[in-house]
Regions:
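Anionic-ligand binding region
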Residues: 120-121
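N-terminal helical cap/lid subdomain that shapes the substrate entry/recognition surface
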Residues: 3-104, 114-117, 126
Length: 128
């Protein structure tokens, strides 16, 4: 049976971006002058995306509003996606083989579409 299509997650699968995502919470706390406990730091690296903002505000005491945190996430990831993001090692060769075989490829991500398009372009894989 021949592979006809493939769906890829973007962050951490196509792109080497997870370290940047993981450092956002701790960076925000440092900027607000808050020292995270080792347990809080561990939790920030393991929580689901939807749980990070409430955790930063309610448990860690980050004084920013939910919207301020969201705006900061978008701004910082846009900067990263515009200039620093790279594809995972070996990805371009793999995608080129799939393309050559006529496999339809799709990206599934929770990241905003504008940022997704920017990231894929910067990483040089938007043409797949």
């Amino acid at each position: 049976m021949r592979l006809q299509s493939a769906i890829f997650d973007m962050d951490g699968t196509l792109l080497d971006s997870m370290p940047t995502w993981r450092e956002l919470g701790p960076t925000f706390l440092k900027e607000a002058g808050i020292s995270a406990t080792p347990e809080q730091d561990r939790m920030l690296h393991t929580l689901a995306d939807c749980d990070v903002i409430p955790y930063l505000r309610e448990v860690c005491g980050l004084p920013w509003s939910q919207q301020e945190i969201i705006d900061q996430i978008i701004q910082r990831m846009e900067t990263f996606y515009s200039s620093q993001v790279r594809p995972k090692p070996g990805l371009e060769k793999f995608l080129s083989i799939l393309k050559m075989e006529g496999v339809w490829m799709y990206v599934a991500t929770a990241t905003h579409r504008r940022l997704t398009e920017k990231a894929l372009k910067t990483a040089g894989i938007d043409h797949y």
